[in-house]
């Protein structure tokens, strides 16, 4: 397939879509690839949303195009084109659903759009003809109106010469002023001044009858007059009504508060931040206790190891001298042993006392810190309870 033919068909499709006022975006990449999903939205819009006349035609022929998959949609479209538009596409259903045949698919879409626009114009012409025929039928029907009903509708006027004129094509009628009470000499079809005055009096009576209901409600008129005369009173009444509504809301809120108090009776309410602070302090105390226990055990182990090392240092040289030397060596070794036996316990006691004093100082400091933290937590609890 030549690329020039494909471009030409795409330009043709763009022109048809402009004349159709297609609002959505067109998937040109899918159309070039021959993807069926790119052309189905255009066909669906043209048949369902473009023309209300075409949509009515589909409804009358009981054709549904909504909520269907691609295969069923193409099947119904092909049937619709065959039955309503007398159009047979170049491709079969299987070929149209398959990928490919890009140029032929674009041509089919253009043909469908042109068929829809042509059908739309035909239906508009039929609708116009039917409406014109109805208007003609209505105008041809005679209006059932009597002569007595026509007279009030006509414009009435009196000429300067005393002639009684009407707006129609009737001849002017001369009013004869010289007549008896029995209307002798008055021809038929003439209208006298007495008749005109009688009609005016009847219309005045009708207007008075219409105005009677307004006069039947003097209380309403009095209230309206009071409102117009005293706008401050109306404003006060409105404010009073608003205050009453607010009082009702307050009573409802008080009842709800009482229910909440009854539900939370005996429970301690603590702020979330204070509670989190308290939990963090408790965890710190627990960790410090564990660390202090571990440090004490480590110090004891170190002290025991120091004592053992001191005892080993004191007794090992004595054994060596005793095994190697003679009499003099024995004398010297005995002196050394005496010194070591006197000095070793003293040094071990001193080291143990120093370690004990150091450990006591650290424990006292830790206890003071813990005491301070406990006091702070107690104050926080008091503040939260208040």
Swiss-Prot record:
TM region positions: none
Subcellular localization(s) per the UniProt record: Cytoplasm, Cytoskeleton, Microtubule organizing center, Centrosome; Cytoplasm, Cytoskeleton, Microtubule organizing center, Centrosome, Centriole; Cytoplasm, Cytoskeleton, Spindle pole; Midbody
Annotated keywords: Coiled coil, Cytoplasm, Cytoskeleton
Domain of life (superkingdom): Eukaryota
Cleavable signal peptide: none
Assembly with partners or alone: Interacts with CROCC. Interacts with POC1B; the interaction is direct and recruits POC1B to centriolar microtubules. Binds to centriolar microtubules.
Function summary: Centriole-enriched microtubule-binding protein involved in centriole biogenesis. In collaboration with CEP295 and POC1B, is required for the centriole-to-centrosome conversion by ensuring the formation of bona fide centriole wall. Functions as a linker component that maintains centrosome cohesion. Associates with CROCC and regulates its stability and localization to the centrosome.
Name under which the protein is recorded: Centrosomal protein of 44 kDa
Native organism: Mus musculus (Mouse)
